A protein has these predicted regions:
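A short beta-strand micro-motif common to beta-rich folds, especially ectodomain repeats
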Residues: 50-76
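Long, low-complexity ectodomains and other extracytoplasmic segments of secretory-pathway proteins
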Residues: 1, 5-7, 65, 74-122
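Short, composition-biased motifs enriched in small/polar/acidic residues
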Residues: 376-475
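Intrinsically disordered, low-complexity Pro/Gly/Ser/Thr-rich segments with frequent PxxP/GP/PP motifs
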Residues: 15-59
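Short acidic, flexible loop segments centered on an aromatic residue
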Residues: 1-14, 88, 192-198
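Aromatic/hydrophobic beta-strand junction motif of beta-rich domains
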Residues: 1, 36, 174-176, 419-423
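Short proline/glycine- and polar residue-rich coil/turn motifs
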Residues: 23-32, 261-265, 448-453
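Surface-exposed extracytoplasmic segments
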Residues: 109-376
Length: 475
C-alpha cells in the first residue's frame, strides 16, 4: 500500500498537478496505473525567473526558461518511491494574417494595415515584419530534431533608413525562420550564420550570428562551457586588431527585462545590426547576404542549409516595416500591423515583393506568414483605385469620376484642415493623419457615417504648424 502526494520543487503561478487517486495497493508481481493530471492557466503565468538566479550577467538582462519541476511520491511505512516530473511552460498564441495576397493601388508609396486573427494567452505577443528575401524548401530527408531546427524555411530583411534618414543611424534587421525549434540559440546547438559580402567579390566579409554573453566575452562561440542565458546578435570577422567578435545588440531586438521574446524552444529569430558596423555609409549602401545554417556540435557542425545570395540596399527598402514598438520591426500582435510599400521603387527595379511575418509566441504549428504584394492591381477606369478597392468602397470601378479619394476641394479653415471625399450610402469611414509619408498614420477618433454624395470632416485637433498628410479608410 502506498500514499501518493506531490513534492513541488520549482513552481509557476497557474500551473499545478492533481492526483485523483491518493492511495493505491499493488499486489505482489503486479502493477497499477496511477492517474496524474497536469493543468495550466497561461493567463496566470507571471513570467518571473528563479529567485535564486541573478537576473543579470555582466549588467545584461538574462532570458528565462519558465519551468516547473518536482516529484510524485509513493510512500508507506518502510519506503518512499519518487517519480520526477519537469515541464517547460509558456503562454502561447495562434496568430495569423487574414490575407495571403494584397493588390496595391496605383500609387508610388502605399500604406497598409495587415490584420491578424487568432488568440494569445500571452499578454504581449510579438510579431516581427520584414521584406521577404527568400524561401528554402523543406528538407524532408532530415529526421533528427537538431538538424530539422537548422532547416531554413524563409528569411527576410528590413531597414529603418526611411525613418532615420541617415545610413549612420540606420539599423538593419535580418529574420530567419526554420522548420523546427531549437532548444536554445547557442551556436553549439543551432549555428546560424548570416553571411554578408559588402564588396561583391564573392567572398564573405562578415557573419552575423546568435551568441551568449559568455561566448562573446571569451571571444569563442563554440565552447559550451562559456554559454549563459544572455543572448546577443554578434558580428563575426570584424577586421579588428584584438578581437574577432563584436556585440551589435540583443537577439530579437529587445532585452528580456523589457519584452519576453521567447528565444528558447523557438524556430524564429531576429538579428539586428547597425548599418555602419557593416562598413556602410552614404556612399556605400548595399551588400549581398545569405543564410548558412549548421547542425549541432555533437554531430560535427554539419551543413544543413545554404540559401542563394540576395542583394539589398539599406536606403531602398521596398517594404518599410520599422513602424513597430520603439520604431523597430517588432510589433504587438494584438494590434494591426502598419507598414508601407514603395511600389514605385519595386516597379522601377522589376521586383516582386512580399512581406514576411514571424510569430514569436505562436505554437510550432504556425510560426510564419508570407503576404504576396501585387503591384499591378486591376483598375478598369484608370482612376488610381483598384477594382477590388472600389467595390469594397461602394464606388463604380467603371467610372473614373466615381472614386474613393480625398477631393482637391479640401482646404484649411480656422478650425483646422477640412477634408472632403465622395461617400456612398450605407458606408462608414475613418480618417488617419501623419506628419510625413515615412511615418505611421494615426487614426483619429470616431467612425464617420456616410453623408452622400459628399463627406466633410474638419480636423480640429491638427497641429497649427507643419505639413500634414491624410487618408480615408473604409473599415
Amino acid at each position: 500500500k502506498f500514499d501518493l502526494f506531490v513534492e513541488e520543487t520549482v513552481t509557476e503561478t497557474g500551473f499545478g498537478i492533481e492526483l485523483p487517486v491518493k492511495k493505491i495497493t499493488v499486489s505482489a508481481q503486479s502493477h497499477e496505473l496511477v492517474p496524474v493530471r497536469f493543468h495550466a492557466d497561461p493567463a496566470q503565468f507571471d513570467r518571473t525567473g528563479d529567485p535564486l538566479t541573478p537576473a543579470k550577467l555582466n549588467d545584461r538582462a538574462r532570458s528565462w526558461v519558465y519551468e516547473v519541476s518536482g516529484k510524485i511520491v509513493l510512500a508507506n511505512d518502510t519506503e518512499k518511491l519518487r517519480v520526477p516530473y519537469h515541464a517547460l511552460v509558456r503562454a502561447a498564441a495562434t496568430k495569423h494574417t487574414t490575407e495571403s495576397r494584397i493588390a496595391l493601388p496605383n500609387r508610388n508609396l502605399v500604406s497598409l494595415e495587415l490584420s491578424l486573427e487568432g488568440d494569445s494567452a500571452h499578454p504581449k505577443p510579438l510579431v516581427s515584419v520584414f521584406e521577404l528575401a527568400g524561401v528554402s524548401p523543406r528538407n524532408n530527408l532530415l529526421t533528427d530534431a537538431a538538424d530539422i531546427s537548422a532547416d531554413v524555411l524563409a528569411f527576410g530583411v528590413a531597414s529603418d533608413y526611411p525613418q532615420s534618414g541617415s545610413v549612420a543611424e540606420t539599423t538593419v534587421y535580418f529574420a530567419i525562420s526554420n522548420a523546427g525549434p531549437w532548444t536554445n540559440p547557442h551556436s553549439f546547438l543551432y549555428d546560424p550564420h548570416l553571411q554578408i559580402d559588402t564588396n561583391f567579390d564573392g567572398w564573405i566579409d562578415h557573419e552575423l550570428a546568435s551568441c551568449s554573453n559568455g561566448g562573446f566575452i571569451k571571444d569563442d562561440l563554440t565552447v559550451s562551457g562559456y554559454a549563459d542565458d544572455v543572448f546577443l546578435s554578434i558580428l563575426i570577422r570584424v577586421p579588428r586588431a584584438e578581437r574577432g567578435l563584436a556585440d551589435v545588440g540583443y537577439l530579437n531586438v529587445f532585452p528580456p527585462d523589457e519584452f519576453d521574446t521567447v528565444p528558447f524552444n523557438n524556430s524564429v529569430m531576429v538579428l539586428p545590426i547597425p548599418a555602419r558596423m557593416l562598413g556602410l555609409d552614404e556612399e556605400k549602401t548595399d551588400f549581398d547576404f545569405r543564410v548558412l545554417t549548421l547542425g549541432a556540435e555533437q554531430y560535427g557542425y554539419p551543413e544543413i542549409d545554404r540559401t542563394e545570395l540576395i542583394r539589398y540596399d539599406v536606403t531602398k527598402p521596398v517594404v518599410h516595416s520599422a513602424f513597430g514598438i520603439n520604431g523597430t520591426v517588432m510589433y504587438d500582435a494584438n494590434e494591426p500591423i502598419k507598414i508601407a510599400v514603395d511600389r514605385g521603387l519595386a516597379k522601377r527595379e522589376g521586383r516582386r515583393p512580399a512581406v514576411l511575418l514571424l510569430h514569436h509566441m505562436n505554437t510550432d504549428d504556425h510560426k510564419l506568414d508570407i503576404v504576396q504584394l501585387d503591384l499591378d492591381a486591376d483598375d478598369a477606369d484608370a482612376d488610381g483605385a483598384s477594382d477590388d478597392d472600389e467595390l469594397a468602397a461602394g464606388t463604380d470601378p467603371a467610372d473614373p469620376d466615381s472614386v474613393f479619394a480625398i477631393l482637391p476641394a479640401s482646404r484649411k479653415t480656422a478650425l483646422g484642415p477640412e477634408i472632403r471625399w465622395h461617400s456612398v450610402a450605407g458606408k462608414s469611414y475613418q480618417v488617419q493623419r501623419a506628419a510625413s509619408l515615412g511615418q505611421a498614420f494615426e487614426t483619429l477618433p470616431g467612425l464617420l457615417p456616410a453623408t452622400p454624395p459628399l463627406n466633410v470632416f474638419i480636423d480640429k485637433t491638427a497641429p497649427k504648424e507643419g505639413e500634414l498628410f491624410y487618408r480615408i479608410l473604409k473599415p
